[in-house]
Regions:
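Short loop/turn segments that connect beta-strands within the blades of beta-propeller domains
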Residues: 56, 93-94, 103-104, 137-138
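A short beta-strand motif characteristic of beta-propeller blades
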Residues: 30, 69-82, 116-125
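Beta-rich, blade/repeat-based domains predominating
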Residues: 81-93, 125-139
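Conserved beta-strand positions in repeat-built beta-propeller and related beta-rich domains
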Residues: 45-55, 99-103, 143-145
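Structural motif
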Residues: 54-62, 106-109
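Bacterial Sec-dependent N-terminal signal peptides
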Residues: 2-7, 14-45
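Short loop/turn segments that connect beta-strands within beta-propeller blades
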Residues: 65-67, 111-115
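Mobile, glycine-rich extracellular loop/lid and propeptide segments
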Residues: 98, 105-111, 121, 130-136, ...
Length: 145
């Protein structure tokens, strides 16, 4: 009896496995993100996602009010490298974005209009500083660790 159940279970599992080989995805139209790293961003806003802890998958996306599209992981697309591990806070100062990347112990500085990386400022005071929050006042940027 148990052997028959095992055979039936094995047969069903095999059919399901084979069935997945014959599934297909529909082809998608290009989303228009190709070459977007070279154009200047205008009306819209940035969305920073912290990602999963320890996964080095923080992103900086841009939502365009003009066309209603979200341009995912724009920082990586523009710069050829990811934002880092666990982005925590972001502030706009003039034409620059200052992004606190906690797990990578740094501040990423990017151009607000193009998302191009301008600088990476390492925070290496102490054993493991882990910067968290950022503020601007009277021409200075302050970071808490």
């Amino acid at each position: 009896m148990i052997k028959n159940r095992m055979r039936i279970f094995g047969f069903i599992a095999g059919l399901l496995s084979i069935g997945t080989l014959f599934t297909a995805c529909e082809p998608t139209e290009p989303d228009g993100n190709e070459g977007e790293s070279s154009k200047e961003l205008s009306k819209g806003f940035y969305v920073m996602t912290e990602g999963l802890w320890g996964q080095n998958n923080s992103t900086l996306d841009f939502y365009s009010i003009e066309d209603g599209q979200t341009h995912l992981d724009l920082f990586a697309l523009t710069n050829g490298l990811g934002l880092g591990e666990t982005a925590n806070d972001m502030i706009e100062v003039g034409n620059k974005l200052f992004i606190v990347v906690n797990g990578s112990n740094c501040i990423m500085v990017a151009d607000k209009k193009t998302c191009k990386k301008l600088a990476m400022i390492p925070i290496n005071q102490g054993e493991n500083p882990q910067p968290r929050c950022i503020a601007y006042h009277n021409g200075s940027v302050f970071v808490s660790c």
